Amino acid sequence: MTSAVHLTFSYLKRTLLFRFEAGTSRGVLHTRDVFWIKVHRMGDVDQVGWGEAAPLNGLSPDFLPDFEEVLGRLLVQANHRSWDMEEESLLQQVKALVPFSLPSIRFGLETALLDFLNGGRKRILANTFFDQGAPIPINGLIWMGTKEFMLQQINQKLGEGFTCLKMKIGAIDFAQELELLRYIREQEAAKNLVLRVDANGAFSIQEAMGKLELLKDFGMHSIEQPIAVGQWKAMRELAVKSPIPIALDEELIGKIDKEEVLNSIQPQYLILKPSLLGGILETREWIQLAEKLGIGWWMTSALESAIGLNAISQLTSTYLPSLPQGLGTGKLYDNNLESPLVVQFGEIQYNQEGIWETPS
């Protein structure tokens, strides 16, 4: 039986600055607010756990005008309770304290507590990524933008040795997007490239199948969210008839009854974003159900800083993934934290000799 302890919780806010105009289906991003959760024993800051709560505008259920006040109130409650210091127990305690409707706070609190439990070294879970420096294969992301900007990114990612590219589509003329995909396939470096596209729900139900037929010629691995969320019957029909495997992404956010979603649509893949789904415990439940139903999956970060990306990478590593994951590179922001996370040759790795910058 582990002993319960009282801990001190607080947070720091930083506005991260994008290095470029980050085009998404919900507009162009220039900045991103993150809240780093800090936990330690009262009067002892030698051992500190850090987590990240950073809701995304237009995607996170907890992107709220009073988010900072909500976070502050929950941390006051966390200060006034005792914590049973065991991994599974901590996850259950966070679930009991933080409502399902606040997924980024759940994720941040889970991460901070597990980091503290493991000595405040940024080790969240037992995993080969942190413990042995084992790399995780990732996809190179091609952001939405002008055709010229997307072409520039394609050449850069191929030059960096990525073996899997994911291109966001639905922002520019579809014919131009097809030209870009054709260009990728014509490159010598892309002969065996795994190619994914993410439509972010951009296709109408009426046009979706026609566009999928045009995309199939490029040897697609999968397409994420071809139509908008909430159209389960139409999405199920696409999952049955599409020449390209369907992956659900936004469709999973805010869903308590996981089995209902998956049985209704029966997709080929799931895209799992822990900070949007409710953290480690919720993500593990999605994976357990997906594997029971024979549905593939991969993990994806959601523009987190190095604190969040580190936690998601470690969670991913516990499953020893073979598919390329959608983990970020940590190079999105001018003022991200310095960290041991490095990306080279299409893999993310934890440099065990690297140094962490302390959040401030």
Predicted regions: what is each one?
Residues L113, Q314-L315, S322-L323:
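Short, Φ-rich (hydrophobic/aromatic) sequence segments
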Residues L12-R14, L141, D249, T300, ...:
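Conserved beta-strand termini and adjacent loop/short-helix elements that scaffold enzyme active sites
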Residues L320-K331:
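Short helix/strand-capping turn motifs
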